Structure formats: C-alpha cells, structure tokens
UniProtKB/Swiss-Prot annotation:
<keyword id="KW-0418">Kinase</keyword>
<comment type="function">
    <text>The function of this protein is not yet clear. It is not known if it has protein kinase activity and what type of substrate it would phosphorylate (Ser, Thr or Tyr).</text>
</comment>
<dbReference type="Pfam" id="PF03109">
    <property type="entry name" value="ABC1"/>
</dbReference>
<dbReference type="InterPro" id="IPR011009">
    <property type="entry name" value="Kinase-like_dom_sf"/>
</dbReference>
<keyword id="KW-0812">Transmembrane</keyword>
<dbReference type="InterPro" id="IPR045307">
    <property type="entry name" value="ADCK1_dom"/>
</dbReference>
<dbReference type="InterPro" id="IPR004147">
    <property type="entry name" value="ABC1_dom"/>
</dbReference>
<feature type="domain" description="Protein kinase">
    <location>
        <begin position="179"/>
        <end position="419"/>
    </location>
</feature>
<dbReference type="GO" id="GO:0004674">
    <property type="term" value="F:protein serine/threonine kinase activity"/>
</dbReference>
<keyword id="KW-0472">Membrane</keyword>
<feature type="transmembrane region" description="Helical">
    <location>
        <begin position="50"/>
        <end position="67"/>
    </location>
</feature>
<keyword id="KW-1133">Transmembrane helix</keyword>
<dbReference type="GO" id="GO:0005739">
    <property type="term" value="C:mitochondrion"/>
</dbReference>
<protein>
    <recommendedName>
        <fullName>Uncharacterized aarF domain-containing protein kinase 5</fullName>
        <ecNumber>2.7.11.-</ecNumber>
    </recommendedName>
</protein>
<keyword id="KW-0723">Serine/threonine-protein kinase</keyword>
<dbReference type="InterPro" id="IPR051130">
    <property type="entry name" value="Mito_struct-func_regulator"/>
</dbReference>
<comment type="similarity">
    <text>Belongs to the protein kinase superfamily. ADCK protein kinase family.</text>
</comment>
Length: 580
C-alpha cells in the first residue's frame, strides 16, 4: 500500500527523468505545417470550396428533404427527375429521326430518281427505323406519348405504311404499375384500400392503356366490374410532357418545314386534359348510351358512381373479342358483315345526327359479343375522348356528302366553304377516302404505271395541300376525320363485307333530312307538297348513290381485269379505295 509521501516522490522522479520539456501545441502545429510540400500549403480557391460544398451538400439536403416529405410530395420530386429522363429520351429520338432523314435524302439518295426501286428501298428502311424509334420512345416514356402514338395511327393516308404498321402495337402496350401505386391512389381518392371497397380485387391488370390500367373486381353484391385506374403521376406530369412535345415538334418543323404538326398538339391539349378526368368519361358514357339507345345492339357498360372518382372509373365488366378479330368472331358463330354494318351505322349516327362523336374507336375500344338474340352486340369502351360537332357543321357535312354523291360541284364548293375549306375536291377525297371523280382517275391515273395507287400518291404528292386543308377545318372535324378513317380501317380488316360508302351516304342524307325537319318544323308543317319534295329528293339521291356504287365496283373489276392481262401493274391500294 503506497503512502502519500511515497507517491509524491515517485511522481517527482518521473518528471525529472525527461531530458526535454513537452512541446506546446502551437510549436507542434508550426513545425508540421512548415514541413508540408509547397503545393499543399497554397490556399484553396473560393470557387472550388463553393463547388465542393454544393456537390456534397446539395444531394444531402435533397435527400433529407425527400425523406421528410409526404408521399404525394415525394412523388412530385421523383417526377422532376423522371421528367428530365423523358425529355432526354424524347430529344434523342427526335434528333435521331431528323438526322436519319436528312442523311438519307441529302447524302445517300442524292441524284437518285425519286420513284426508282433503290430510292423506295432506302426510304422504306428509313421510315422503318423512324417508326421503331418512335415506338420504343413512346413505350419508355408512357402516358401521353403512347396516346399520341396511337393518334398517329389514324393518319394512315398521310404517313408511310411503315409507320402505321409499327405504331399499331401501341394500341395494347403501355406501362404497367405495381399494387403499391394502386393502393396509394385508392387511399388518396377514397381513403380506403381496394379490398375494402370491393369483395374481390385482382391487382394483376387485364389491360393496360396509355393513361390507365384495368383491373377485374367484384362488388359486394356479386356484380363483376372493370376498374379503370389512372396512372398516379399522369396529372402531375401532363404539363411537362406537353411542353416537351411542343419543343420537339418545333425542332422538327425547323429541320423539315413541311412537317407542321405542332398546331395539332395545341388543339389536342384540351381534349387530352378531358381524358384525364374519369368523371367526365363516365358522363360521356351515359350520354352515348342514351343517344344510341334505339340501336339495341350497342352496349355501353353501366358506370358505378359510388366506386368512381376523377382517377378511378368502375363500370360493368363486359367480355368480348376485338372488333377486327375475324377468327374469334367466327368462332362465336357471328356474321362478319352484320358486325361491319352495325359498326358503320352506329358511328354514322353520331357523326351525322347526334353530333356527340366517339373520337377513339380503335379495335381495342370496340368489343364484339353474342347477344340474347344470337346476333352480334357491339360493346363501346373508353369514352374519355369525345367531340361535339355543332348543328350547323353537321348540316354542312351532311349536305357536302350528298353533293359529292350527286356530283354537284357548286354545292360541294358551297358546303365545303361553310366548313372553312377552299380546296373542296381535295377535302372531299379526304372525307370519302376514295377518288371523287372516276373520269379524272381513269384518264390520268389508272392507266399510269407510276401512279396506280391514286389516293396514296395524292397524300404524298400533295402533303402541303392536305396540311392546309386540315388547318382550315373546324377543330372538331379533325377528330371526325379520325373516326371516319378508323371505322374504314376496321371495315377493311374485316374484309370489307359491306359497302361503307353506301351506308355512310345514306346515313348522311337521313341525318340532313332529320336536321332540316327539326329546323323547319312548324314552318312547312306536314303538308303534302313538302312530303312529296322529301320523297323525291330521297329517291333521286338513292338512284344516284346506287349508280355511283355500281360504277365503283365496275371500275374495280375492270382494273383487276387489266392487271390480269398485264396491261397495268398491280395496285391493291387502289382496289381497297374503290371497294371500301
């Protein structure tokens, strides 16, 4: 045991045993600093300090902000980052396509004759590369990009076939989201999870579209329903995607002045915004069902409003096959010609009479099923995009169609002018999707080996004139043309079992008669003279229409005979225009 005196002597001995005193901290610091190499002793520039702080501090601050944010704010922060990625991908695709066309037309094909096989082969390959790039970019970006890609399919007489064939894959392809996102959206809109609202809910989507995906579910009363769930980030990214597309279209216009489609995007802004409102879609569906109620074969799924919101739409589940799936249609024992006739009549009723027009009737939105009477029923889906055509425009359109059949140039010019179009012949051909003047066709095109497919050549050679006509039209007419063209394409896919030209023309005149009757009701009354006048006009039109149809069929048969005799080259596109 140490005593206090012994401890003091021990510590004193330790202190006196050191030869040198302990250096002070200041001396130690100065000695080490002086020993550093010169390059490390120079002061750090201010800009480097700021940059280092920003590089290290900014991610830390953003990360902390993200961790502390609520779920909805986290999603918006992710959207900013994802938006930069979408912009980069879109810019890459736009530049790739533009430079590819520039290289082909100005370098590879310089001095090559435009209609030569080599020219057509190179351009076809260029078109295919561009279409593949568009599809890949649209699928990667999703949402609005897929929707616009689907819209391009309807321009199948303005765009090369490589585009329309390739872009059709977008009708059924879109991004699919996980169950966590579905749960998050239901909690935001209903403050409940899907399994709390429904007796059964399948998180695996049965279909995925450009704006939403569809889930199978069952209500508590056992009713099978389809639940359309919007992608949760679409509303937040809508404005950014629109601005990106506007920028890219302007860039393309600078490089290719004749390709001026930015005005189309401007006009579609409002309609696309409407499609994001599923409550509006539900109201559209109910109005469509009311206005087509006199067609017993048209089915519109009933909306369940207590399970719907602006981002969720619940409606009756209706099974069926696509309207262009000929094998599935025949396997049900249904007649293809019956389906084609019903399809044309239903949409012609909207165009020429009600004016409330389904603007996206692609095959994925029209299903076919067997009804109680054993005949086909048409199930109309996706009522988000509708266009209303004013009565004066409907009347002008009906009378223009009638004037085309009667070959009344003065009336054609007058009614086209009422729609704001000056080049009435070109507009008539765009509207009818077939040549208007058979004499002109026969004299200058049918016997020409270079221009056998008249309508295809018209679209390519007069691209700027076609664009001018589209700009002159009332904006609702753009979606009307899309409807007409889509229905025509479905009729072709079914093998053109009915005369679309004949059915549309009859509906146009009937629509004009009903509109005129509503306008002058109480003025002319039901006098015998007025009735006789209506009967005479209808009879005159019926005769002219049947003669026109017969002339078209004879022309197509004669063209095929000339091809068989090797007097003219094959032109399947021409036959389709003459027969469908």
């Amino acid at each position: 045991m140490w005593r206090p005196v012994q401890l003091c002597h021990f510590h004193s001995a330790l202190l006196h045993s050191r030869q040198k005193p302990w250096p002070s901290p200041a001396v130690f610091f100065r000695r080490n600093v002086r020993g550093l190499p010169p390059r490390f002793s120079s002061p750090t520039p201010l800009w480097r300090k700021v940059l280092s702080t920003a590089v290290v501090g900014a991610p830390l601050l953003l990360g902390a902000r993200y961790v502390m944010a609520e779920a909805r704010e986290k999603r918006r922060m992710r959207l900013v980052v994802d938006g930069m990625g979408r912009f980069g991908r879109s810019l890459k695709v736009g530049l790739q396509i533009s430079l590819d066309y520039w290289w082909c037309t100005n370098v590879v094909l310089r001095g090559v004759e435009e209609n030569s096989p080599g020219y057509l082969e190179v351009m076809s390959a260029c078109h295919q590369r561009a279409a593949d790039a568009l599809v890949a970019g649209a699928i990667s970006n999703g949402g609005l990009y897929v929707k616009l890609g689907q819209g391009l399919c309807s321009f199948n007489h303005l765009l090369p076939p490589e585009y329309t064939r390739t872009l059709r894959v977008l009708e059924d392809r879109a991004l699919k989201r996980g169950f966590q996102e579905v749960d998050e959206l239901f909690l935001e809109d209903f403050q409940a999870l899907p399994h709390e609202l429904f007796q059964e809910f399948d998180y695996q989507p049965i279909a995925a579209a450009s704006l939403a995906q569809v889930h199978r579910a069952k209500l508590h009363d056992g009713t099978s329903v389809a639940v359309k769930v919007q992608y949760i980030d679409l509303r937040d990214r809508f404005d950014g995607d629109i601005h990106t597309l506007e920028l890219l279209l302007r860039l393309v216009e600078v490089m290719h002045p004749s390709f001026g489609f930015s005005w189309v995007l401007q006009d579609l802004k409002g309609t696309l915004a409407q499609e994001l409102d599923f409550e509006n879609e539900g109201r559209n569906a109910e109005r469509c069902a009311r206005e087509l109620a006199h067609f017993p074969y048209v089915v519109v799924p009933r909306v369940h409003w207590d399970k719907s919101s602006k981002r969720v739409l619940t409606a009756d589940f209706c099974a069926g096959c696509k309207v262009n799936d000929v094998e599935a249609i025949r396997s049900q024992g249904l007649a293809v010609h019956d389906i084609a006739e019903k399809l044309i009549k239903a949409f012609a009723e909207q165009i020429f009479y009600t004016g409330f027009i389904h603007s996206d009737p692609h095959p994925g939105n029209v299903l076919v099923r067997k009804g109680p009477d054993g005949k086909a029923e048409l199930v109309l889906l996706d009522h988000g995009l509708y266009q209303f055509l004013e009565e004066k425009d409907r009347a002008a359109l009906c009378q223009l169609w009638r004037a085309i059949i009667l070959r009344d140039d003065a009336a054609m010019r007058a009614h086209a002018a009422a729609l704001g179009v000056q080049d009435y012949l070109l507009f008539a051909e765009m509207l009818m999707q077939r040549p208007v003047r058979l004499g002109q066709l026969w004299g200058s095109h049918l016997l020409s080996r270079e221009e056998a497919a008249y309508m295809v050549d018209m679209a390519r050679e007069r691209f700027e004139a076609v664009m001018a006509v589209l700009r002159e039209l009332p904006r609702p007419m753009l979606l009307v043309l899309r409807n007409i063209n889509t229905v025509r394409a479905i009729n072709v896919a079914l093998g053109a079992p009915v005369d679309r030209y004949f059915l549309m023309a009859k509906r146009a005149v009937r629509g004009w008669s009903r509109l005129a009757g509503a306008t002058y009701r109480g003025v002319y009354g039901t006098s015998l003279l007025r009735h006789a006048k209506v009967v005479w006009e209808m009879l005159k039109f019926e005769v002219a229409l049947r003669l026109e149809t017969l002339a078209m069929r004879l022309t197509a048969l004669l063209a095929r005979a000339l091809v068989h005799l090797s007097l003219v080259p094959p032109a399947e596109e021409l036959y389709q225009y003459l027969e469908t």
